[in-house]
């Protein structure tokens, strides 16, 4: 066959891109999720969480550093969180499996199998449990959920830093589990039209106070914001702050919503974090900080109102 009549080479076929998950299915990966409050992780204590369907051990070393491991021993699938934090022969802090005493450093590498004898010559460091990158700032612990569970790559960006984390410890912390996929919980966070009906309260605003209004939205990194504006005049909750409050509400993937209110030099930050536990359960955490003196007077009433809001949303979703 001559060169001119030779068959053309077949075009190489690329693997098709994975089909995007339908609404209410799957999770957003390769990003940071809120995992826990820093105050929940005590030095030396091991705690079990469920995040994106994964069993996760979150802990804090005796030196104060937070870490995350898959909460399954690769030997007999015992939960590592049922073990204890100890030290291996090299002096490194390590999690001891409660079943056969295998030791795993906080980077996930196995450092000791007590039942082995020296003559066996096994390289135990080839055994690993999945390590989840963890970052802690502003009293919040975030966990990086990678699409490749075998990847050792570090995250390419840090978690969100929030404006308005002022006044020392949070003025309110509330938690609840919604029996829905995170997509439905996120829609509940963004939906502006349900407020007059679901959250009609005498101290907030009544159904009779509805009126037409428009808000300006702008893009933000991995999300968008309702740009800073004067809050609704018909809201008594804003009125008690006095002065001329301004508020900006920001939404960021995969499940963060925060409202930053300024009243002169005073600030209020209301942060809502959605953490998928599984395909059918989502943990919602509400945290409020402020340096406004009014919170010292209304703290019990404010906490009760905020908890009522959260449970009203839970009833709907």
Give the positions of each predicted feature.
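Rieske [2Fe-2S] iron-sulfur-binding domain
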Residues: 2-23, 37-165
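A short, structural micro-pattern
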Residues: 29, 128, 135-137, 268, ...
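A short helix->beta-strand "capping" segment at the edge of beta-propeller domains
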Residues: 28-35
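Short, low-complexity intrinsically disordered segments
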Residues: 30, 100, 142, 200-202, ...
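C-terminal catalytic domain of Rieske-type non-heme iron oxygenases
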Residues: 3-5, 65, 77, 149-317
């Amino acid at each position: 066959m001559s060169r001119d009549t030779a068959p053309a080479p077949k075009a190489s076929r690329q693997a098709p891109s994975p089909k995007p998950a339908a609404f209410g299915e799957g999770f957003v990966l390769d990003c940071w999720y809120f995992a826990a409050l820093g105050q929940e992780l005590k030095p030396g204590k091991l705690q079990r969480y469920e995040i994106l369907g994964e069993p996760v051990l979150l802990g804090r070393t005796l030196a104060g550093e937070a870490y995350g491991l898959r909460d399954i021993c690769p030997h007999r699938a015992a939960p590592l969180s049922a073990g204890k934090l100890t030290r291996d022969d090299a002096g490194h802090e390590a999690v001891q499996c409660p079943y056969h005493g295998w030791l795993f450093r906080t980077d996930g590498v196995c450092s000791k199998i007590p039942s082995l004898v020296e003559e066996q010559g096994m390289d135990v460091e080839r055994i690993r449990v999945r390590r989840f990158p963890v970052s802690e700032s502003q009293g919040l612990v975030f966990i990086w959920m990678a699409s490749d569970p075998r990847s050792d790559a570090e995250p390419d960006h840090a978690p969100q830093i929030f404006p308005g984390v002022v006044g020392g410890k949070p003025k309110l912390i509330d938690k609840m589990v919604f029996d829905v996929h995170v997509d439905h919980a996120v829609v509940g966070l963004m939906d502006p039209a349900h407020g007059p009906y679901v959250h009609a309260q005498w101290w907030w605003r009544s159904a009779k106070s509805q009126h037409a209004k428009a808000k300006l939205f702008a893009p933000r990194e991995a999300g968008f914001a309702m740009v800073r504006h004067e809050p609704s005049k018909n809201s008594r909750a804003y009125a008690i702050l006095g002065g001329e409050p301004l508020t900006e509400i920001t939404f960021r993937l995969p499940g963060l919503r925060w409202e930053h209110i300024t009243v002169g030099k005073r600030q209020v930050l209301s942060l809502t974090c959605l953490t998928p536990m599984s395909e059918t359960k989502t943990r919602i955490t509400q945290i409020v900080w402020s340096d406004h003196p009014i919170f010292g007077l209304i703290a019990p009433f404010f906490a009760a109102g905020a908890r009522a809001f959260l449970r009203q949303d839970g009833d709907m979703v």
